[in-house]
Every structure is written in structure tokens, then in C-alpha cells.
Amino acid sequence: MHIEIRKRGKRKLYYLAHSFRHGDKVRKLRRYLGEDLTRNAIELLRQKAEKSILEQASSLRAIRDPLHTILSSKEMELIKALISKGDIRIKHLSEEEWLKFAETFAYNTNAIEGSTITASEARGIIEENEWPPERSKEEISETYGVAETIKYVRKTKEHISLSLMKELHRIVFSNSKAFAGKFRAPGIEVAVTDSHGNIIHKGAPQRQVIAVLRELVEWYKKNRKRYHPIVLAAVVHNQFERIHPFQDGNGRVGRLLLNNILLKHGMPPVNIELKNRQEYYQALRTYENEGNLRPTIELILKEYRELRKLLKRM
């Protein structure tokens, strides 16, 4: 940001100006500070003006929740610019690369939810059927379950449905959870807490779960040809996580749904890494609190770059 001075007769008018890229264009925002100001007055006025400019710039960069608002042409331009810069050029995966992806995805998606199985142990479980003696049978079965669900996602022709959601959950948790493949029963409400026990998210009331899931399915059917696949996948994933239809296991099913949408549109799969867990959670919070999809899109593009690096090392 910088100070601009404009002269009108004998008067000097002071502005705080800020230039930034918005989509494929450069935007400039200004705030009027006053006339004939001293240096101290400029500094005092600058602080408030700077905050105002940053808030406006942030709102301009935001991508609204398409579930409730049709995206504007400027937002569509912004998405196009983000994706073009994201460089997601990844060839279709070979069977060897799919195996590597399944192992990496199974490790990370379970670790995000607290699994203690390491990356090398996940590889041994999936490739060699090796059971680490110090790990629980539940963690081991969920590692198998995620890998099997990746196979299912590759084969199914379904994009999204309530039966698909339940089937993904059933495959992952069939040997670890009694409620595998079943939405929350009456009286079961869920909340997500942080490490201090503070509630950071409450799922939809149990009695509303079926209705809001159907709304999501209908939105996807209506908009599947309107928006870029990454936008579709991000909305489906984020909205699914907001609803939290299962008693447990929503994060893993949500990330599988994310990949299912991408694959059905000819896109490569994406792996949300454990090291990016906080960024992932923050993207979900920003979507829930502000209706801003941009952080989720940026994270997906970031993970595509990481996937390309992983495949190059094979």
C-alpha cells in the first residue's frame, strides 16, 4: 500500500492506495484520508484505512458458496485464473500409480482422523497384508477399507447419491464400526471439537439429515455442467462435512466423495495430506462461517502439485 497525493488548486488531497490481482486483472482500491495532512495525521488515518482496504480486497477475492448463490462472472473469472495457475497437468494414472495413490491416500485420510498407522505400515498392509502387531485391528481394517473404497470409486458410474454415501461408509468401516453404512439414528447428534474440547462445528440435526443431503444431490445434478469439476467437488465435500450425516467417519467419506466427483469429470484424484490438516480445517471453517469456497479450491490445487511430485518420484 502507498500514499497518493492529488492537488486541487492549493490543496493537497491524501489517499491510501492498494493494487492487487483479481482474476486475470489488476484492481486498485483507494481510501480518502483528508487534505493538507501532517505526517503524524497520515499515519493515524492510515491504520483505519488500511484495515478497510484489506477487508474489501478479501471480499473481492472470495468465491461465494455456489450452493446458495449463482456465481458471478467475476467469480468465474477468478476460478478460471486460479485453476490455470494451479498447473494440474497430471496424466492418467497407471495401475502402479493408482496403488501408490491408494496407499498414500489411505495413510493420510486416516491419520487426519487420528490413526496411528504410519505411511510405511499402510504400504505393508495394502501391498503385503502385513499386520503391525502394535496397531489395533480397527485401524488396520480401516486402512484396508479406504484402499478398497478407492477401487470402488474408480469403478462406479454414480456421481453422487445417498446410497453411494452409505456404500462408501460401509466399505471403509465394515469391520470397525457397528453402524457402518448407516446414517445417524434418531437421537444421535454430532459435534466436532478442537484439542481443548471446544465445539467448532455441529452437524445438521439428525431429523434434517436426509432432507439436506437430497438438496445437495439435486444441486449437483442441476449444476454439474455449469461449474468446473473442482468447484463441484469442493462444494459437495464441504457441504457433506457441514451436514455430518454419519455418527463417525464423515471426514473420510467426504474426501472419498471429493475424489469421486473429480474422477467422474476426468480429473485426477487428490490427496489431502496430514501435514496440511490445519489448512484443511481452516478452509472448512472459512466455508462454513463466511460462505467462501476459495481456500478449499486453493488447497485442492496445492495438493495436485504435491501429487505430481509424488508420481515423479516413482
Which residues does each PLM region occupy?
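FIC/Doc superfamily catalytic core
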Residues: 1-248, 252-314
